[in-house]
């Protein structure tokens, strides 16, 4: 209560005046270093196809950065381009490259593959400790694991997201045979178990868990999550993993009139007390001013 901002009412958040002010700030913060041949602004009458590529193009976390509140709506770069382009311009998207390795995850989530106790989705137990100990004071059911909470948010029955752990369980029925990738993203961290074991894991900053599945077989899925403090999030996705192929990417966008690349750094690499340990980064701090090798 020492400063007037401490008594700001919730009704002020995202009010029309503030939204307009934030938009103007965003517009005036852009620095155009080069505009060769007057390319910008784009003329929708002359552009038939736009290719949007890069690891930051369709990533909500990249829009939020490191220290953030929770807007009611988040628009990624890809979504913004599609909105501005309208129906008259074709917009295609390829991730193309990852931040620091050559793995590319392609989401192909199928909610019909996950069920428990006769219900689609996951059972979940929450604990007010970081060790999954004792009797869970709050249990629930999620059709999908995809949560984002502010610091100290109550998830239910008095359990808050500070010094909290949770475990989701389900049975996964493989839709086909072959390699299936489960991507786990979490703040602070989460680990996936399949049939009681941690499966093969790939990726330097992304957690890609690999299952060599047999069509029709059922696998026990368990996701264990821990959150100590600050903002929290956890998400489970499924799809397939492939290696980046620059030549294939170039061929796939060769007919585009405009190519927009969204890459560089990311809050998935830089932050405070992170688990990232890769060349150029140590626990969220930079050890080099060079861009990642990719």
Where are these regions (language model features)?
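C-terminal non-catalytic regions of proteins with extracellular/luminal or membrane-system context
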Residues: 6, 12-13, 20-294
């Amino acid at each position: 209560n020492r400063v007037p901002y401490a008594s700001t009412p919730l009704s002020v958040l995202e009010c029309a005046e503030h939204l307009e002010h934030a938009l103007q700030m965003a517009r005036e913060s852009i620095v155009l270093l080069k505009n060769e041949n007057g390319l910008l602004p784009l003329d929708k009458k002359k552009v038939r196809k736009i290719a949007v590529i890069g690891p930051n193009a369709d990533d909500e976390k990249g829009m939020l950065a490191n220290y953030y509140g929770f807007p009611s709506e988040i628009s990624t770069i890809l979504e913004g381009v599609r909105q501005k382009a309208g129906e008259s311009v074709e917009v295609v998207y390829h991730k193309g490259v990852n931040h620091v390795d050559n793995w590319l995850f392609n989401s192909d989530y199928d909610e019909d593959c996950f069920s428990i106790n006769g219900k689609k989705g996951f059972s979940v137990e929450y604990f007010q400790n970081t060790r999954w100990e004792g009797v869970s004071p709050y249990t629930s059911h999620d059709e999908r694991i995809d949560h984002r909470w502010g610091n100290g948010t109550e998830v239910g029955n008095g359990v808050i997201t500070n010094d909290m752990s949770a475990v989701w369980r389900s049975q996964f029925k493989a839709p086909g045979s072959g390699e299936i990738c489960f991507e786990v993203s979490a703040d602070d961290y989460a680990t996936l178990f399949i049939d009681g074991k941690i499966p093969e894991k790939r990726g330097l900053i992304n957690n890609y868990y690999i299952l060599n599945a047999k069509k029709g077989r059922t696998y026990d899925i368990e996701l264990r999550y821990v959150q100590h403090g600050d903002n929290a999030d956890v998400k489970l996705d499924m799809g397939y993993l492939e290696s980046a192929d620059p030549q294939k990417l170039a061929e796939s966008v060769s007919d585009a009139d405009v190519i927009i690349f969204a890459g560089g750094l990311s809050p998935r690499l830089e932050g405070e007390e992170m688990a990232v340990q890769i060349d150029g980064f140590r626990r969220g701090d930079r050890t080099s001013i060079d861009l990642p090798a990719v």
